[in-house]
Swiss-Prot record:
PROSITE patterns: AA_TRNA_LIGASE_II
EC number: 6.1.1.11
Keywords from the named record: Aminoacyl-tRNA synthetase, ATP-binding, Cytoplasm, Ligase, Nucleotide-binding, Protein biosynthesis
NCBIfam families, alphabetized: serS (TIGR00414)
Organism taxonomic ancestry: Bacteria, Pseudomonadati, Pseudomonadota, Betaproteobacteria, Rhodocyclales
Organism: Dechloromonas aromatica (strain RCB)
Ligand binding (L-serine): 233-235, 287, 386
Designated gene of the protein: serS
Residues annotated for ATP binding in this entry: 264-266, 351-354
Family membership noted in the UniProt record: Belongs to the class-II aminoacyl-tRNA synthetase family. Type-1 seryl-tRNA synthetase subfamily.
Example GO molecular function: serine-tRNA ligase activity
Main location: cytoplasm
Cross-referenced InterPro entries: aa-tRNA-synt_IIb, aa-tRNA-synth_II, aa-tRNA-synth_II/BPL/LPL, Ser-tRNA-ligase_type_1, Ser-tRNA-synth_1_N, SerRS_1_N_sf, SerRS_core, tRNA-bd_arm
Name recorded for this polypeptide: Serine--tRNA ligase
Pathway: Aminoacyl-tRNA biosynthesis; selenocysteinyl-tRNA(Sec) biosynthesis; L-seryl-tRNA(Sec) from L-serine and tRNA(Sec): step 1/1
């Protein structure tokens, strides 16, 4: 959430910043409400001053034994008007909050300006895509030929955009998650968490999924109780650990890693990636979350992104880092790097991790604060990124490590998790 004081003091700068996202926002409603608020605030303060003055007169009159009924009637009338003014101010606050809740974050000054993914800027590449001496198959064909990837049975059980992994492939999927967790905890200093897969609306509001993106979520109704939602990412439960908390400055940074399934309706996918495991309703992710001092968030963003890259390098998967342009960033992000892994069957790079710095945007929605060196509370900065998406990493291994005989070579770093197995072959 943006700071309402920023809108009040420099609305033009806010509008200019948000316009970089490619969708100019009409602030006429905000301006009209703000004008009414100022008038009402001034009138309320005048009425309060009048009431206080008249109340003193009443005391003086009564002290002299004189009639105070006329002045008391004036106080009563002022009280009625005050009550109406205060009620309207409360309504305006609700309207302001609704406007603020719908506004995305302002892109950082370092973010390239562009309207869509064509404006994204490549920062680096790592690894050289393999040259095959046989016809490359996509991950769906590779997995099905192994007899270990079954979309038909998954569709029977649940419908489209689900998969069923079997045998060695299921074990490889588990090995990937374990390897990622071990790396981030042992080498990168993260604390592992096991978090709820169902969260309340307040948690989704805090990280920015609600109210704008409810159609992307799976909602669980519970009779007359408040609904819960299946998490779209571990970012939601993990970041909300600091909701409504005041931390000590010494406690920062907080660095958490969490492996969860993620659930998304893919309402806005427009029929993309229907085949295979690229875009599913249920998929696993190992998520990195940091809560940091505001002065450290830019540095933390580079660190977190690099930690996700290290996983790809250990797996020997070619990738590139992209700086997302202003029009392609997520709602809550101030700056985002995407890591894209090479998929030979598609002959292109595809997103496997998105690493974002949210600045104070989420913290303001969550009221996640720390006490600074002047003993005053200040908003934290939050960051997160996939370290990595497990299913898409599995896809990349199936495609990049496939062999002419249909087998798949297991990356060396995963073999200890696979009982020393070097190759996945058809049963």
């Amino acid at each position: 959430m943006l700071d309402i004081q920023q809108l009040r003091s420099n609305l033009d700068a806010v509008a200019e910043g948000l316009a970089k996202r490619g969708k100019p926002i009409d602030f006429s409603e905000f301006s009209a409400l703000e004008a009414e608020r100022k008038t009402l605030q001034t009138r309320t303060q005048d009425l309060q001053a009048q009431r206080n003055s008249l109340s003193k007169q009443i005391g003086m009159l009564k002290g002299k034994g004189e009639d105070a009924s006329e002045v008391m009637a004036q106080v009563g009338s002022i009280g009625d008007e005050l009550k109406a003014s205060e009620a309207r101010l409360a309504e305006l606050l609700t309207q302001f909050n609704a406007i603020l809740a719908a506004l995305p974050n302002i892109p950082d000054d370092s973010v390239p300006v562009g309207s869509d993914e064509t404006g994204n800027v490549e920062i680096k590449r790592w690894g050289t895509p393999r040259v095959f001496d046989f016809e490359v198959k996509d991950h769906t064909d590779v997995g099905e030929a192994l007899g270990q990837l079954d979309f038909g049975t998954a569709a029977k059980i649940s419908g489209a955009r689900f998969s069923l992994l079997k045998g060695g492939l299921a074990r490889l999927h588990r090995a990937l998650a374990q390897f990622m967790l071990d790396t981030h905890t042992a080498e990168h200093g993260y604390t592992e968490l096991y978090a709820p897969y169902l969260v309340n609306a307040a948690s989704l509001y805090g990280t920015g999924q609600l109210p704008k993106f409810e159609e992307d979520l799976f909602k669980v109704l519970r009779g007359d109780q408040d609904p819960l939602y299946l998490i779209p990412t571990a970012e939601v439960p993990v970041t909300n650990i600091v909701r409504d908390e005041i931390l000590s400055a010494e406690a920062l940074p907080l660095k958490f890693v969490c492996h969860t399934p993620c659930f998304r309706s893919e309402a806005g996918s427009g029929g993309r990636d229907v085949r295979g495991m690229i875009r599913q309703h249920q998929f696993d992710k190992v998520e990195l979350v940091q809560v940091v001092h505001p002065e450290k968030s830019a540095e933390a963003h580079e660190e977190l992104t690099r930690q996700a890259e290290i996983i790809l390098e250990k797996l020997e998967l070619p990738y590139r880092r992209m700086a997302l342009c202003s029009g392609d960033m997520g709602f809550s992000a101030a700056k985002t790097y995407d890591l894209e892994v090479w998929l030979p069957a598609q002959n292109t790079y595809r997103e496997i991790s998105s690493c974002s710095n949210f600045g104070a945007f989420q913290a303001r929605r969550m009221q996640a604060r720390f006490r600074n060196d002047k003993n005053k509370t200040e908003l934290c900065h939050t960051l997160n990124g996939s370290g990595l998406a497990v299913g898409r990493t599995l896809v990349a291994i199936l495609e990049n490590n496939q062999n002419a005989d249909g087998s798949v070579t297991i990356p060396a770093v995963l073999r200890p998790y696979m009982g020393g197995l070097e190759v996945l072959s058809a049963a």
